[in-house]
């Protein structure tokens, strides 16, 4: 299962990554972004695919 993490606070991003990797070893973290703009760009890049997106609800740009 491919996972994208969208979080603008780097420590929170790292913590979520660590928790997911420890508890769900079959998850493949395919990317992490820090803004709405960078997330849209990531999603529109050919070849990028996420089955699940963990997204901060209070991003600075959206």
Predicted segments, located by residue:
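The feature encodes the CheY-like receiver
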Residues: 60-62
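Short, surface-exposed linear patches
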Residues: 26-28, 51-54
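Acidic, metal-coordinating helix/loop segments flanking the phosphotransfer/catalytic sites
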Residues: 17, 32-52
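Conserved acidic carboxylate
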Residues: 7
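Two-component/phosphorelay signaling modules centered on CheY-like receiver
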Residues: 10-32
């Amino acid at each position: 299962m491919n996972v994208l993490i969208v979080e603008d606070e780097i420590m929170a991003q790292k913590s979520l990554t660590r928790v997911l990797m420890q508890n769900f070893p079959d998850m493949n973290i395919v990317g992490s972004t820090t803004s709405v703009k960078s997330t849209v760009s990531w999603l529109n890049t050919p070849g990028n695919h996420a089955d699940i997106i963990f997204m901060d609800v209070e991003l600075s740009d959206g």
